[in-house]
Amino acid sequence: MDPKCSLILLSGGKGERFGANQPKQYLPFQGEPLILHALKTALHIPEITEVIVVCDVSYRHIFEGFPVKFAESGKRRQDSVFSGLQHVSNPWVLIHDGVRPFIYPDEVTELIAVAQQTGAATLVSNVPYTIKQRHPVKTLDRDALSIVHTPQCVKTEILSAGLEFASREGITLVDDTQAAELLDIPVSLVSSKHPQIKITYPEDLTIAHALL
């Protein structure tokens, strides 16, 4: 099966929880905008043959000199993914958050291989703490739960159909592989072997620097 994938790099978030005067994916990290750390890694992964950056037009200059396509960001995550999907030319697509500076080539290779067995796969890690449901209050079995990360990999036609279904039914998705779930397509879970960090709060940048 052809492992070639397109990467949709989501960069439309405003970073309101971070409190900075610019979106957190563009904050300085190792002397350049944070998002470029993930992009540079992705461009050296053989399975990724095209990258679509979904961002506001005013930030496109940040990606000058990189071989990427652009798509307009939408109101919701799923709208941005659908926008990027219109520029995808491969049968498989990876979706990655621009506020996650680390992409690991070995995990991308495994993720794609696993996704091709079922149609969709996502990186996950174990839940290390106790989780309680709010209403009614009860303790959940953390062994039955996983923390979801990106990238996620979905067959392009499945992602497109799932997003269209969600739009018709007025469903707001919380992650990208949920589009496959809506079509009753099983999603495979790939356990991450590396530290995962999403830049949400200022202290997350300190952690990211420590992981280099």
Swiss-Prot record:
Keyword Transferase carried by entry: yes
The Swiss-Prot or TrEMBL record describes its family as follows: Belongs to the IspD/TarI cytidylyltransferase family. IspD subfamily.
Pfam families reported in the protein's UniProt record: IspD (PF01128)
Q: Which GO terms describe its biological process?
A: isopentenyl diphosphate biosynthetic process, methylerythritol 4-phosphate pathway
**Sorted alphabetically, which SUPFAM superfamilies does this protein's record hold?**
Nucleotide-diphospho-sugar transferases
Q: What is this protein called?
A: 2-C-methyl-D-erythritol 4-phosphate cytidylyltransferase
Q: Which organism is it from?
A: Chlamydia caviae (strain ATCC VR-813 / DSM 19441 / 03DC25 / GPIC)
E.C. numbers = 2.7.7.60
Q: What does this protein do?
A: Catalyzes the formation of 4-diphosphocytidyl-2-C-methyl-D-erythritol from CTP and 2-C-methyl-D-erythritol 4-phosphate (MEP).
The UniProt keywords, alphabetically, are:
Isoprene biosynthesis, Nucleotidyltransferase, Transferase
Q: Which HAMAP family match?
A: IspD
- Renumbered to this chain, the signal peptide range is none
InterPro entries registered for this protein in UniProt: IspD, IspD/TarI, IspD/TarI_cytidylyltransf_bact, ISPD_synthase_CS, Nucleotide-diphossugar_trans
- Which residue positions hold the site described Transition state stabilizer? R17, K24
Superkingdom of this protein's organism: Bacteria
Alphabetized GO MF terms: 2-C-methyl-D-erythritol 4-phosphate cytidylyltransferase activity
